[in-house]
């Protein structure tokens, strides 16, 4: 059986364990997820929970979305995903909270990677560059495409769009959970830019639960860092306004 929850990537920070070890973590905001639909093998051919999180403006939701959410007595959601073979006896309209996970468990995190636009084959695919001598006629070009055949085979490694792909980071450690602030801390980095949506599920790989314990309260350090960032941005805005007034 699988546990899962939807959330939004806040950013990265560092926390200390009770043994004084410094670990990098990604902070994910996972507000209570609404169970929009419970799928069963009898009616849908498979078992799954359809979760939704972060309200969508009514004007931005079409009639089918509004009607679907209304069945669960909820507002239309911006991010909707299914958790296959979900653990727990949930009903339509119930809420899945962040405490479904605990520190020491391992999860798979799925998200859309950062987009980098059109890039060459060296940056995009890690290919080697050509000779950098003056006599060379190519340095960062893709090079030969092959001989004779006057077509490009499907799957040929060439320059193109980089990023913006659905990727899954597997077997990441849950460093801590803060139910009061709807935060989950995951060791290491996860796919996607800040404020992007992510899906957190129980890992498909075998693991042994880790006995990790953070020093202090999980939310205190994260809130303190967010407060420092906000105060810095406020000071920068005030300085900018003062400069504009002086001019």
Swiss-Prot record:
Gene Ontology MF term list: rRNA binding; structural constituent of ribosome
Cellular component aspect of the GO annotation: cytosolic large ribosomal subunit
Disordered, as annotated region: 124-145, 218-247
Biased composition regions of type Basic and acidic residues, renumbered to the chain: 222-241
Domain of life: Bacteria
Alphabetical UniProt keywords: Ribonucleoprotein, Ribosomal protein, RNA-binding, rRNA-binding
GO biological processes: translation
A Pfam family matched in the record: Ribosomal_L3
Record-stated family: Belongs to the universal ribosomal protein uL3 family.
Protein function: One of the primary rRNA binding proteins, it binds directly near the 3'-end of the 23S rRNA, where it nucleates assembly of the 50S subunit.
Assembly notes: Part of the 50S ribosomal subunit. Forms a cluster with proteins L14 and L19.
Name this protein carries in UniProt: Large ribosomal subunit protein uL3
Gene this chain is encoded by: rplC
């Amino acid at each position: 059986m699988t546990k899962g929850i939807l959330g939004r990537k806040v950013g990265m920070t560092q926390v200390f364990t009770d043994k004084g070890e410094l670990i990098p973590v990604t902070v994910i905001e996972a507000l209570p997820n609404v169970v929009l639909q419970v799928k069963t093998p009898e009616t849908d051919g498979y078992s799954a929970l359809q979760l939704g999180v972060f309200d969508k403006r009514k004007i931005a939701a079409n009639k089918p979305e509004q009607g679907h959410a209304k069945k669960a007595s909820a507002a239309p959601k911006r991010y909707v995903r299914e958790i296959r073979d979900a653990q727990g006896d949930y009903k339509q309209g119930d809420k899945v909270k962040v405490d479904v996970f605990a520190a020491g468990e391992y999860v798979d995190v799925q998200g859309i990677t950062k987009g980098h636009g059109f890039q060459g084959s060296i940056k995009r695919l890690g290919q080697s560059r050509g000779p950098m001598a003056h006599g060379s006629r190519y340095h960062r070009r893709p090079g030969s495409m092959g001989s004779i055949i006057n077509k490009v085979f499907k799957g040929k490694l060439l320059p193109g769009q980089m990023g913006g792909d659905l990727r899954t980071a597997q077997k990441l450690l849950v460093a801590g959970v803060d139910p009061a602030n709807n935060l989950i801390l995951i060791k290491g980095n996860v796919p996607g830019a800040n404020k992007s949506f992510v899906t957190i599920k129980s890992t498909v790989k075998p693991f042994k639960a880790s006995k990790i314990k953070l020093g202090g309260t999980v939310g205190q350090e994260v809130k303190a860092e967010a407060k420092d960032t906000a105060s810095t941005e406020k000071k920068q805005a005030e300085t900018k306004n003062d400069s504009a007034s002086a001019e």
